[in-house]
């Protein structure tokens, strides 16, 4: 399921689409989002291969980003996205 993550949202404010890799983004966390998926797409000229990314669902509505979603580079803790991750685990108990 989705993971709750914290991120630095400075570069999210101007995002309109594609895979965002703001390497100069601070890792100071200031916004909560949901990590809902991952993938790889596009051409990364530096490495001559596809760019892996996380798919983030934001709370700013469907008119922001790609219908309310954000793709950010995966694997380098860009904007602190890998720093604070939370999930919920269900515990099933039996009653006697």
Curated annotation (Swiss-Prot):
Disulphide-bonded residues: 25-79
Entry-linked InterPro entries: Papain-like_cys_pep_sf (IPR038765), Pept_asp_AS (IPR025661), Pept_his_AS (IPR025660), Peptidase_C1A (IPR013128), Peptidase_C1A_C (IPR000668)
Active-site annotation: 31, 58
This protein's record includes keyword Ribosomal protein: no
GO molecular function terms attached to this record: cysteine-type peptidase activity
Enzyme class: hydrolase
Enzyme Commission number(s) of this protein: 3.4.22.-
Alphabetically ordered keywords of this record: Disulfide bond, Hydrolase, Protease, Thiol protease
Keyword Protease set for record: yes
GO biological process: proteolysis
Domain of life assignment: Eukaryota
A Pfam family it matches: Peptidase_C1
SUPFAM superfamilies: Cysteine proteinases
PANTHER family xref list: CYSTEINE PROTEASE FAMILY C1-RELATED
Similarity comment text for this entry: Belongs to the peptidase C1 family.
Name of the protein described by the UniProt record: Cysteine proteinase
Organism: Carica papaya (Papaya)
């Amino acid at each position: 399921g989705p993971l709750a993550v914290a991120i630095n949202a400075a570069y999210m404010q101007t995002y309109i689409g594609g895979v965002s890799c703001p390497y100069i983004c601070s890792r100071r966390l200031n916004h909560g989002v949901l990590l809902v998926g991952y993938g790889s797409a596009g051409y990364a000229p530096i490495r001559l291969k596809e760019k892996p990314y996380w798919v983030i669902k934001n709370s700013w509505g469907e008119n922001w980003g790609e219908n309310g979603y954000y793709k950010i580079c995966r694997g380098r803790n860009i904007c602190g996205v890998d720093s604070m991750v939370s999930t919920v685990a269900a515990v099933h108990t039996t009653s006697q």
